[in-house]
């Protein structure tokens, strides 16, 4: 098994790391639920995989804490807390779109840049149904959320708590919906079907458009809707 993993790693280095972004878009290697090794070290590779429910275990308590702080420490009314919470949720939708479009789909020129891009997002396009790489691993989500917390803290002052709670709630919605669009085939609701079709087109037809995952509104605003 170890030799098989090493061989995949070597193949990725030779075949994909130097040419992740193909002329037609992101190349799909497999649509099965299989997980390719990104590192020769099994320990490092473990940190690149995560079960879908892990973000809930980490961040639901964070959301609850900041809602509690909003009401008890900063004495916001429930109405104001909800209003600011929804504001944070709205901010997330913009960040989600911008990150996906300009960071995850940035086309690096250098070899290290291409390796990093493949580990961050290219592997998801190559193996779109890998159930262990559909939500953000804690090694990425915790540092990023910490950075955004301080951003809210320094910019929004006492309003940071409900805004940040809504922002993290938006992130969890994104993670859960992203996983669901790939694996929750039992959900038949029309809104979810439309969201799933939108994301599947991004993977299988037009990776240069359709960057919204939990919401399609910013694709409409910034004219990155599908052309046909």
Model-inferred region functions:
Residues 181-192, 208:
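Interfacial helix-loop-helix junctions of multi-pass membrane proteins
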Residues 190-197, 203:
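Functionally important transmembrane alpha-helices
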Residues 1-164, 176, 208-228:
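Non-catalytic, topology-defining segments of multipass membrane proteins
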Residues 168-175:
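Alpha-helical membrane-embedded segments
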Residues 75-77, 172, 189-191:
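N-terminal start-of-chain detector that recognizes signal peptides
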């Amino acid at each position: 098994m170890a030799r098989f993993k090493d061989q995949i790693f070597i193949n990725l280095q030779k075949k994909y790391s130097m040419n992740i972004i193909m002329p037609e878009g992101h190349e799909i290697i497999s649509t099965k639920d299989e997980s390719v090794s990104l590192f020769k070290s099994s320990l490092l590779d473990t940190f690149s995989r995560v079960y879908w429910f892990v973000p809930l275990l980490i961040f639901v308590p964070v959301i609850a804490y900041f809602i509690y702080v909003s009401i008890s420490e900063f004495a916001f009314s429930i109405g104001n807390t909800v209003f600011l919470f929804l504001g944070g949720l709205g901010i997330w939708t913009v960040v989600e779109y911008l990150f996906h479009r300009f960071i995850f789909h940035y086309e690096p020129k250098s070899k290290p840049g291409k390796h990093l891009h493949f580990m961050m997002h290219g592997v998801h396009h190559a193996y779109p149904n890998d159930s262990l790489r559909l939500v953000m691993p804690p090694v990425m989500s915790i540092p990023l959320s910490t950075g955004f917390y301080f951003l809210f803290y320094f910019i929004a002052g006492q309003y940071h708590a409900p805004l940040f709670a809504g922002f993290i709630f938006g992130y969890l919605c994104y993670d859960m919906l992203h996983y669901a669009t790939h694996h929750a085939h039992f959900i038949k609701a029309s809104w979810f079907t439309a969201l799933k079709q939108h994301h599947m087109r991004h993977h299988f037809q037009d990776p240069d458009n359709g960057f919204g995952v939990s919401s399609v509104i910013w694709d409409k605003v910034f004219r990155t809707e599908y052309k046909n």
